[in-house]
Curated annotation (Swiss-Prot):
Keyword field: Acetylation, Cytoplasm, mRNA transport, Nucleus, Phosphoprotein, Protein transport, Repeat, RNA-binding, Transport
Organism: Rattus norvegicus
Top-level division of the source organism's lineage: Eukaryota
This protein's encoding gene: Xpo1
SUPFAM superfamilies, alphabetized: ARM repeat
Phosphotyrosine sites (modified residues): 454
Protein name: Exportin-1
Example GO BP: ribosomal large subunit export from nucleus
Residue numbers of Phosphothreonine PTMs: 448
Amino acid sequence: MPAIMTMLADHAARQLLDFSQKLDINLLDNVVNCLYHGEGAQQRMAQEVLTHLKEHPDAWTRVDTILEFSQNMNTKYYGLQILENVIKTRWKILPRNQCEGIKKYVVGLIIKTSSDPTCVEKEKVYIGKLNMILVQILKQEWPKHWPTFISDIVGASRTSESLCQNNMVILKLLSEEVFDFSSGQITQVKAKHLKDSMCNEFSQIFQLCQFVMENSQNAPLVHATLETLLRFLNWIPLGYIFETKLISTLIYKFLNVPMFRNVSLKCLTEIAGVSVSQYEEQFETLFTLTMMQLKQMLPLNTNIRLAYSNGKDDEQNFIQNLSLFLCTFLKEHGQLLEKRLNLREALMEALHYMLLVSEVEETEIFKICLEYWNHLAAELYRESPFSTSASPLLSGSQHFDIPPRRQLYLTVLSKVRLLMVSRMAKPEEVLVVENDQGEVVREFMKDTDSINLYKNMRETLVYLTHLDYVDTEIIMTKKLQNQVNGTEWSWKNLNTLCWAIGSISGAMHEEDEKRFLVTVIKDLLGLCEQKRGKDNKAIIASNIMYIVGQYPRFLRAHWKFLKTVVNKLFEFMHETHDGVQDMACDTFIKIAQKCRRHFVQVQVGEVMPFIDEILNNINTIICDLQPQQVHTFYEAVGYMIGAQTDQTVQEHLIEKYMLLPNQVWDSIIQQATKNVDILKDPETVKQLGSILKTNVRACKAVGHPFVIQLGRIYLDMLNVYKCLSENISAAIQANGEMVTKQPLIRSMRTVKRETLKLISGWVSRSNDPQMVAENFVPPLLDAVLIDYQRNVPAAREPEVLSTMAIIVNKLGGHITAEIPQIFDAVFECTLNMINKDFEEYPEHRTNFFLLLQAVNSHCFPAFLAIPPAQFKLVLDSIIWAFKHTMRNVADTGLQILFTLLQNVAQEEAAAQSFYQTYFCDILQHIFSVVTDTSHTAGLTMHASILAYMFNLVEEGKISTPLNPGSPVSNQMFIQDYVANLLKSAFPHLQDAQVKLFVTGLFSLNQDIPAFKEHLRDFLVQIKEFAGEDTSDLFLEERETALRQAQEEKHKLQMSVPGILNPHEIPEEMCD
């Protein structure tokens, strides 16, 4: 069978592509089937045939046959793809009679298929695709070649309800294409013309919608009309909304009909979102009428949370749409309702609904409600941030300090507080969670959705606390009592309460915060003693740790408490339940960062600073921790030591602090001095890696003073580096590159990497560049550069490049003299690893360009000093970078190029020869990425670079002729150069299009956003053949706009003395 199929495919390939014979529709159906249901070689063959056929310039002439005679739906879809392709790219070069023919054919087909209601249901997808084809034709034809389209479609709609229903879909699609998705699909000018045409002819469409809504008994048609209307509401002239019966029709006629209520409510939401001041009365009517209908459909005493969980999809959607309506209306027009006493009751009912909907257990709906509560609380707080004297709720309603708007929302806000406390999302810091099976485990994946929800809830609760902190405290204290007495005890309830308590840190006055926190922590510690079972203890422990980590201000002010908390964390470091140790270390590091000074001072009632106690017992504290937890612990203690300002004391602390790792290090180094083979022992190498990781984390926290420890191990460490490098090279020579995957070799590479990390980490935090350059850099270069150059590519450490980049960034001019040596060792050999493709060695790739960027930014003179051949390589590598498909590399490449151009411009001597050699080349390469669709993400940067380059030409900064031997000015030459470049790349463009594009590159080079849109317009144009008729590109109109931009720019320049060259100033201004 496969053999026959392959023969068939081969034969088919020839036959289907032979346009001199009639199309064999059965054969085409077979090939399409083969594409969807075949496999391997035959599927590939089918793919190839169909692609060739689709790309054939005459393929569209076969579409009618395909649509009429094919029995296979997929073949029909394929036929429509061919048609869509020709409409989008070659329409302008088809003879007019053929365009008319295609148009008539498509319209006829749509009318035929959509006039029959049973057909409409059965062939929904097919009609959908046909509609899209018609809209693509409209974007080319209307209004110029089809001025009567709107009246045609409106007229046809009155002949048949089924046809009318489909026409509504076409109008909806057209609206979306023109108003919602036009950016990057059609040029700005054309989009504007289409929008104007739609607005101008909207009255006919609106009458049709009204006619259907008032007269039709056909439910699917009415639904389609409402859906279409929904798409129109965000752009139609406002008179159609507010000066017709539209609002009352939507509310009275459709809102309470189950089939239409969702789309009607969406329409009302869209209208509610309009912000204009002149239609206040209409907004009031919209609100009161909607609320009246709502109360009938969903009485105020409904338990919406329950109704939602038992509801069908349609009912659940209604509740979601209700939340959107209320949120939109209250945000936009809430203050209007507050001002009218007769609307107060309706406002309170709306808020009541919002509270009920906020209890629904569906995150998406809660997020919508939260957006409103956040808006309201923030607005009330910002109106008078400092009027939170006592508790408004407790002091009775007649409290004169309270701003009147707050008074109005008092009781509602108290309910929102309770809601926030009961539903608080999980913060990022909490690692101990209950999983879906009800087990308490460590969380490994961060849930970004939940983190964002937490941030929004936290912000809202902080505002609510500012508005009335006593009420917040009462709610929280009562809920905590119910945890302790067991009436509300559950992991979930305890979690949400503690997360809420942690989230309002800083929102209370310090005295209130102190009183409140002492109660909270005491109760939680009591709960920890009272509850049995490891899971219970783990949950309570995680909550205690989260809360104490959130209140550094309180801890700083209460030493006894801080000490108790830290000792409790040390206790938790021995608790082996999943996640507890991790969280203890994480909380410890947060507290160490925020309270660092308090650990190095002698506190009242203490005989020594607490740091000494920690260092004396360090062995006991960390004995149950895993290696990575030990590293975190070391970093935390490092922050404390970094806070000691007395250098002698600090040095003594660092020695004591690094005692354990140094003992192990010294013994390994001693053994290695006697017998170097110890450095091939897996356990020893692993130990070295762990010790260095400890040093890396310690150095990160201590900063520059760590030099005393680094100096102690520096030369031994570099010797170990060299020795391990030799071991790795020997292993590769003996056993090939595969050996780099072996555990021992990987451990050796870890030691090398951590060595580089330690050095670069310290350099980036050091504060004496000269000392670093003289004492630390020479032995480092000696150990790593030659080793890097000599190694096989697979064994080169990418960290060598990043370390060099960090050193250059930090030391700047102090290292310029070493750049040639660094470049000799790493530049060419790395370039050869990454210039074969865009994928291999991703880390080397990224770091290589970071190094280039560092040299370019901080040691630019070194670039000018390297030989021309090497400089050309540098430039080639930058061009290679911005052509990358890896986004970070491409971005770095563009960044380097932009900085390079700006640096060159500062160097008068070198600049002109640079321009002469490279300017046109760079332009050409930038245009090649601008017009490559896989690089659209870099468009802003492309625009900035091109604008800068065209500006250099225009302002005469390039004095050397870019085209030696030609008498024309550089500006004229570049205009021709770019025009010819684009004409040869896109021969289908008309001269007028290219000329206008090039003009814009000069006119808009001071206005980056406009320049970027100009590029985007050009990208739209290169996708299609324009033919002779370029009228729908509106070139004259665009030309006028560009001329105005040029004049504006000139005016601006004239207003700043000295910006314009004296020879560019008009005569009358010279006197």
